[in-house]
Amino acid sequence: MEVIKVTGAIIYERNKFLICRRGPNEKAAGLWEFPGGKLEINESLENCILRELKEELDIDAELHSLYDNYSFKAKDTIYDLYFFRVKGFSGNLSKTVHDEIKWVELKDFHNFSFLPGDAPVIKKLEKDSKIW
């Protein structure tokens, strides 16, 4: 069974989280997710999420810490997911891959259809709501 390492970013500002909708030409088009992507060969997890944020949103981010890590199985693939808290970023958010970007309060997440693999981190965010 194939194992793919994927990083995601938890970006929080002014009581809202940044979420992105997958574009029409992407797998799982129309579903919402936290920005991020797949680890490349010989790349660290930290460098992966920083690269993905630059590629997907055209921002330079500063990481705070690893927030959550778990595995998710979809068909014949296991995804090892690593979500990092972002301390801050510079640059203007751009839509290079996603067709929509939104700042959303945690209490409103139920109004969005997320990738199934994001469900565990969303539950953790809700459980940890006092730290946000």
Which ranges hold each PLM region?
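Conserved N-terminal beta-strand and adjoining loop/helix that marks the start
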Residues: M1-L18, K38
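Short secondary-structure junctions
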Residues: E56-L63
